[in-house]
A protein has these predicted regions:
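Basic nucleic-acid-binding interfaces
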Residues: 49
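N-terminal intrinsically disordered, cationic/polar leader segments
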Residues: 1-42, 63, 70-90
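A short beta-strand-loop micro-motif that forms or neighbors metal/cofactor-
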Residues: 45-46
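Short helix-capping/linker segments at secondary-structure and domain boundaries
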Residues: 56-63
């Protein structure tokens, strides 16, 4: 995972591998979303890592959007925000 700071937060380049198959994803995380989802209890990278774990438990890597804002996950999985806060904040 590569992290690039942006004016509003961070941009993450995430590569998922399984065997020889790989998928690449670009995820944006605003400071506001980071604060709301993690409460500052972990680094932004950990929020993205746990978010991908959440997604991979529900769909194959090929189904994950190639580019998205982290808040979009809750549009497809309404329990995302509650679950990710529970994982991160305990």
């Amino acid at each position: 995972m590569r992290t690039e700071p942006s004016d509003e937060g961070w941009v993450f380049q995430v590569t998922l591998s399984q065997g020889r198959a790989q998928t690449a994803h670009r995820v944006t995380v605003t400071r506001e979303a980071y604060s709301r989802l993690s409460g500052g209890a972990c680094p932004p990278e950990e929020l993205v890592r746990k978010s991908f774990q959440f997604l991979l438990e529900r769909e194959p890597k090929e189904s994950i959007l190639r580019e998205f804002d982290i808040t979009l996950i809750s549009r497809y999985f309404p329990d995302y925000e509650r679950q990710i806060r529970k994982q991160i904040q305990g």
